[in-house]
């Protein structure tokens, strides 16, 4: 079974590099200020994202309709 097929898992997609710059500029932040998600997360592995990629997470929201969040993919250091 694919993790992304589960009803509770929101849609994740890799943001193209060109779009990342626009997002950072829009929110006036640096890439290191984005929330993080680990490279070994099952959804990240399934979509093929690698360390340094930015992922868009699209959730249905009862109040906002749709909620979009961005995460920076990082390696887990043990």
Swiss-Prot record:
Main location: cytoplasm
Top EC category: transferase
EC number: 2.7.7.6
Keywords: Cytoplasm, DNA-directed RNA polymerase, Nucleotidyltransferase, Transcription, Transferase
InterPro entries xrefs: Arch_Rpo5/euc_Rpb5 (IPR014381), RNA_pol_subH/Rpb5_C (IPR000783), RNA_pol_subH/Rpb5_CS (IPR020608), RPB5-like_sf (IPR035913)
Any one cellular-component term (Gene Ontology): cytoplasm
A Pfam family assignment: RNA_pol_Rpb5_C
Biological processes annotated in GO: DNA-templated transcription
GO molecular function: DNA binding; DNA-directed RNA polymerase activity
Catalytic activity: RNA(n) + a ribonucleoside 5'-triphosphate = RNA(n+1) + diphosphate
Intracellular or extracellular location(s): Cytoplasm
Record function comment: DNA-dependent RNA polymerase (RNAP) catalyzes the transcription of DNA into RNA using the four ribonucleoside triphosphates as substrates.
Subunit relationships: Part of the RNA polymerase complex.
Stated family: Belongs to the archaeal Rpo5/eukaryotic RPB5 RNA polymerase subunit family.
NCBIfam families, sorted: PRK09570.1
Protein name: DNA-directed RNA polymerase subunit Rpo5
Lineage of the organism: Archaea, Methanobacteriati, Methanobacteriota, Methanomada group, Methanococci
Gene expressing this chain: rpo5
């Amino acid at each position: 079974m694919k993790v992304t097929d589960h009803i509770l898992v929101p849609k994740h997609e890799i943001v193209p590099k060109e779009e990342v710059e626009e997002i950072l500029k829009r929110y006036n932040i640096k890439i290191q200020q984005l929330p993080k998600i680990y490279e070994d997360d099952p959804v990240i592995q399934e979509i093929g994202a690698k360390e340094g990629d930015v992922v868009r997470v699209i959730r249905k929201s009862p109040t906002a309709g749709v909620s979009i969040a961005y995460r920076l993919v990082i390696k887990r250091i043990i």
